[in-house]
């Protein structure tokens, strides 16, 4: 009998697999062409091999270890975008959820891709089966309201960080149920 309901892990890196979507090969994202022409050859390419995507065996070992826990929630940062994912091991066993915190002031997708940011976000969701949602347009933070039965995850943003005059934007909200993958 376990005395706890949630296992919450904090780390700076995203742990769920993130592959670059095929959209990066298109002319729509011409600002990235030179880098992407060198990197993409039609295969699934991890977004960042200097993070967990570069260490898939070690990620599986970590998943195996935490699979013995209840309701795993991985809190991550340092990607400068907001991410929300279900996590599954290589045998498609549900491991937990990942909450990737946004940047407060660092550059993100929105700073790189401008008007094409929503297209990039959607392409990431389509390319990555376990990725529920990504937002690279806004700066802010994430908060968790933890109860015995669920965790409410709220991504909170402001309209700009470049001025003292800003508007608080409507939060993006997810409810994580105990020991269940997120489903909308």
Sequence positions of predicted segments:
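Long, structured stretches of catalytic cores involved in phosphate-ester chemistry, encompassing
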Residues: 1-184
